[in-house]
Amino acid sequence: MATVTAALVKELRERTGAGMLDCKKALESHDGDIEKSIDYLREKGIAKAVKKAGRIAAEGLIFDEATPDHKKAVILEFNSETDFVAKNEEFKEFGRKLVKIALERNVHQLEELNEAQVEGDKKVSEALTDLIAKIGENMSLRRLAVVVAKDGFVQTYSHLGGKLGVIVEMSGEPTEANLEKAKNIAMHVAAMDPKYLSEEEVTASDLEHEKEIARKQLEEEGKPANIIEKILTGKMHKFYEENCLVDQIYVRAENKETVKQYAGDIKVLSFERFKVGDGIEKREEDFAAEVAAQING
């Protein structure tokens, strides 16, 4: 049997919201496999929702910007070890400079950005090494997305002082009214964290996985087989409402309208949402010791 560590219990607790003892039991019965433990907790109805992102840990900032004509936008995650360095003006200036490079040159991948010239003959990767040496803390360019509008426009939104950024690509013309509407939709993406744009983006495997979880929940509740299939239809509709951007209830709506309805005669074509540290493991803090004490106690 795999050793169930305090860190594993902590992660499972963060991702499911389940109690500490439930998390410990789930991990012990599934040899420390966190994904299987999540499914088990959901099947038992102990975990009502799962945060797919996992641990949120690394410090840094999200930089985003669009061209004046709103035909191209860039979003970049630039990480540091501490929040103190993320507030450093040299750190912020370097991030802004890199976004400008990606916006103004033919840069679409992080590898291309690292190879781009930033100061004379110096590459971005070399300039970053210099900055690390100067400030005395490790930093990294984690991810980059470049969105080019073919038949519509793009809009950006930054939240939490640069800790979260969003790009939305829309159909239509970048009129003042449409840009305002697009920014509101980007704010919705920041707040509601949709996993897909629409039902069409949900893969068959993802859908089947959700159905299986729901089916086992209903079986645990003792529902008869003929009723389960009917209930599953409603549960899948709810899944789309909660996870697909265009089907979500618009966060500022007063009349329960969906994002698609709010968008009206323009359509959401794609979106990018970056939050600092999504999925990066952080150093264990005192909470891990607390968990360990309860496991071993």
Swiss-Prot record:
Q: Which GO terms fall under molecular function for this chain's record?
A: translation elongation factor activity
Q: Where is it located?
A: Cytoplasm
Which gene underlies this protein?
tsf
PANTHER family documented for this protein = ELONGATION FACTOR TS, ELONGATION FACTOR TS, MITOCHONDRIAL
Query: What's a single GO BP term from this record?
Result: translational elongation
Region annotation Involved in Mg(2+) ion dislocation from EF-Tu: residue ranges?
82-85
So what family is this one in? Belongs to the EF-Ts family.
One GO cellular component term: cytoplasm
Asked whether the UniProt record includes Transmembrane among its keywords, one would answer no
What is the stated purpose of this protein?
A: Associates with the EF-Tu.GDP complex and induces the exchange of GDP to GTP. It remains bound to the aminoacyl-tRNA.EF-Tu.GTP complex up to the GTP hydrolysis stage on the ribosome.
Asked whether the keyword Protein biosynthesis is assigned, the reply is yes
Disulfide pairings: none
Protein's UniProt name = Elongation factor Ts
